[in-house]
């Protein structure tokens, strides 16, 4: 019906157009137009158009017409002189413009009366061939949906130092992520180990748990290089002539032998050259020039002439033919289709020949080396102290000449770790891989040998679609590069250009030292004085490098240097690594480097003799016995931060594709809110723990609830990225990011608890090395936190660079002024540097020595490293970590080049009349007063990035010249960054420290607005260089109060404000030109762990050996943020409840659920519907409340604070009425939920109100109701905020004078509560202020003392009193029955009180007086008129 409506409307529109054309023609006739000439011209135009678009030629002996998409709109007429006109119709839907992708097929002849069948082209007089292009301008050519199945490569069997390609699909990536989690959350890892021990009840179970834990921490150990760091020391026996060495990739050996010079032998590179090409695979093909030849039944086989061309792929078949497609008989007709195959992208496989593997080795002598020549290879070669050589299987032996040191011979056995017969180097796109030979040969892709250009198995990347009567389409498959990369998971990535650098393999050499000799043994001792050019430095290998400066000129001479245990005993200890050090030149002040190995403990390095002797105290940590275990121990202590890149969940399987989407949509939001700040491993462990509890639960409903919750947690932990952002609170001037808090307090001091850390120092060191090779000499930090990050990792980077033989050191200088920008960027790389266990362990304690080349971070601009050669803004935030003392922020290299600041730490907000732009450096505050204007800005530091538009408020149509904080130093492009009378402060004092921008007068100065004032200029300080104050200032058209900058060096005015008259030479000018809500607490594992630990303590007796480590572990976890102080409070409450219920059969599981899920009180109202629930009912009700809580967070439905306060008030009243363990514990836990701290006062007020109303409802006597009702009514009036609490309180006191001796204990608490309510209404204080309880305590103490009546009372027996039965009651006076209370006062038993009308009138007078001070006098007069009788009134405090 819908289709018919569209067709009807289309027909109507068509009729309207035809009518309009007809009417226009009739008008032309009336005007005398020549219709015949018009028709002739139209026909001529059609013929010319057809001739211009359609082309005629021949194909296989028949006519071929070439058409485009404009020709198929109408009948195509082909003139034929012999047979007359041939009309053809083309109805193909894939006609495009002409290109290489063409198709040719036959248009059959259909006789009159036959409808076309299974053809999209036909003619009425003669069959012809049609040809057209299939390209379109809007999309790519049609591709096949099919893909080639490529078998997975599998894990490489090579022992390799580099990570495999897409290794994340295997278990090793899981272990690496586990290690990453352990590094970032060590407290959780420690507790997980304790849990694993405690969960096992026997040795067998404990072994299983230990196996699991070992799997979790296995990546911390690596057996490839265990016991071998990047530098090993080998000692030859006395008199030995040779020593065997084993060199690995990037390793270095130091050889020491008696009476021989010390040598360093280093493996520099393993490289394979002249790779032979084996086979090329095509993974992306294109199909062009398709042609189809068809025959009718009984007319023979169809034959396409293009079969003879080897570049074409052809396929024969049969189709149904008959009258509807140009055949006289019905049956199967032959069809032959050919298409041209061409390869667009190919993967090439190459083989490595064993004889083409080269090993580059360097040998260095520990001789007389100056600090300038240290690490300078060319200088050392010139001094015959170093040599490089290449070892190949064809030349395994080499002899090196070392000048005066003799010569050394190496006989090597090259043993590559690579079995060249089993591996190929396969290049796919820009990446190369080491692949197994069998896998390579079994690839189901078109291939060609290197000696041929013809492709085999081409049909694997082509698809012949279903054949029609005379037409068959052919399409190519899409690029298979993605499938190849996925299948290559586990293969080792290599770098290939013309050669391949191998990362596996070793070289076994025999070093012959018989011809080595010490140099300088005949020299005399140096007699002049030495001095330490630099303090001795630890190398990180247990040795010390000393740079000495010699003042004498009697060289060459030997250096008297020794290491002694005491200056009183000159017995040498330790040994010299640089054997027989000497000064080589006779020039004065020459410098020499000496390396020595001091003993463990304290020692002295003594240089020189006699009175010219100098010494340096040295301490070497460790012990002689411990040295034997240092390699393995330091390996075990290694902590490696591995990146989470390339994590791939393809191995989970397709079963989650449908279920997972639903789970993600339902629970994803709640999961991010509750668990966003946690590591995914922690989330997974929690899910596994819930699954384990579900399996062990006896009750079916509880088991199902645990299993469902645990399963959802495990799924979301592995599928939802744990991201957290920043939240901003304007009133408290605080900004939260991750799990930390950033506070900007009232004294304008920044307290930041953030610590930036690189994703992994190994990759950062490689990035620095790569940047330095590309001409980047240093880095400019964007913020002070990035600068602190470089300072923190500097030593570790330098160790990595040194251990990988890179002559480069990272130097971090103190930043000067603002943080400036630079044009270059650091680029990402997948490679990482390697570091041995020993080197890592020593890097923690000792800084490495400085290399010859430096990579400079911050500091002043120098000629060696100008800003144009530095990188900047290359790092962005990846993730937030844990911690109470600081939030760890993990960084990664930016993939794109941008000048924008990192948006992950930026918060913007508008609340009321205040707008704030804020990040970890800036707090920019604007206020609305008739118009929005900038009010103040506080700068932790000044940076040079640009504020992103995505985090900018009201940024439409802003002119940069109006921005007070310039856009180039991260000023927001916002209309909030403006103020009338001021333009952009591009020459403000932005290089100063501790800048606060606001609008006020600098102390001791005045500013006047005058036309005679000077023009804008750089900001000027209000004090001169000598400290003299400049008092008179002016501006032309600024607004007052003036713009000022307060800095550490004084007060500065804005650029519009100039000094009236002053000596220009003494002014201090700015040298800058700037133009060049609430968060829900995360679910924490800590509380759950404490419950389990307590259970184990109760189940088993813990000895001191277990208790002390457990307490220390708990303290560690508390410091690291795994347990919060609120968790401790919840834990104490729950343990108390568990002990209280231990002997009564009660259950505290529902209370534990309230504590762990932090359920808001409003969702627990259902538990209040009955005074007694069974244990199972309690658990189910709380689970329901937990689900309600999760749903409200996910749907972002906030629960109003009054509802939560009312719920807690009702819980407290219920606990007072029915004091069971559950009813008492529940309100305490509810008060500890997030956000309840701001509702304590509301809760107290509601409790008072509930008790008051209940007591009024139960009051049987009108008098008491009037007394208590008056106070409650006054309290209700004051809570609205419209009535004065002081006036109402005074009025009630006057009405009811206190005549009691003192307060009873029950009424004292009522007094405290009422004072809370009144003072809370009077003073709008912060919820964290302690002034309320302090003020109340003082007020109550004074009031109690002043208002009380004290009487000395004693008992004295005067006489015996007895009742006489004769005493009769006579008279007609009214009888008054009284009772005596605890305070000794008499009360009428039945006192009606004042009439209701008088009571209402009095309350109205008191309320009127409280409403406005002007009504106090008339209200007092009206009140006095009601005082007709005198009655004893109750005390003011007589209220619940």
Curated annotation (Swiss-Prot):
Recorded hits in PROSITE patterns, A to Z, give:
FLAVIVIRUS_NS2B (PS51527)
Q: What are the site positions for Cleavage?
A: 31-32, 53-54, 146-147, 222-223, 722-723, 1074-1075, 1301-1302, 1432-1433
Which note does the record give on the cofactor? Answer: For RNA-directed RNA polymerase NS5 activity; Mn(2+) is more effective than Mg(2+).
UniProt intramembrane stretches = 1405-1425
Q: Which GO terms describe its molecular function?
A: ATP binding; ATP hydrolysis activity; double-stranded RNA binding; protein dimerization activity; RNA helicase activity; serine-type endopeptidase activity; structural molecule activity
| Example GO biological process | proteolysis
Q: Which InterPro entries match?
A: Env_glycoprot_M_flavivir, Env_glycoprot_M_sf_flavivir, Flav_gly_cen_dom_subdom1, Flavi_capsidC, Flavi_capsidC_sf, Flavi_E_Ig-like, Flavi_E_Stem/Anchor_dom, Flavi_E_Stem/Anchor_dom_sf
Interacts with and activates NS3 protease as annotated region, ranges? 1355-1394
Q: Which residues are glycosylated?
A: 68, 376, 852, 929
Q: Does the keyword Glycosyltransferase apply?
A: no
Concerning PTM, the database record says: RNA-directed RNA polymerase NS5: Phosphorylated on serines residues. This phosphorylation may trigger NS5 nuclear localization.
Propeptide stretches are: 32-53
Q: Any S-S bridges, and between which cysteines?
A: 225-252, 282-338, 282-343, 296-327, 314-338, 314-343, 412-509, 526-557, 726-737, 777-865, 901-945, 1002-1051, 1013-1034, 1035-1038
- Membrane side Lumenal: which residues? 1200, 1259-1269, 1324-1326
Which residues point to the Extracellular side?
A: 57-180, 223-674, 723-1147
SUPFAM superfamilies the record matches: E set domains (SSF81296), Viral glycoprotein, central and dimerisation domains (SSF56983)
Q: What function does the entry list?
A: Non-structural protein 4A: Regulates the ATPase activity of the NS3 helicase activity. NS4A allows NS3 helicase to conserve energy during unwinding.
Q: What is known of its domains?
A: The transmembrane domains of the small envelope protein M and envelope protein E contain an endoplasmic reticulum retention signal.
Official protein name in the record = Genome polyprotein
Task: Tell me what organism the protein belongs to.
Answer: Japanese encephalitis virus (strain Nakayama) (JEV)
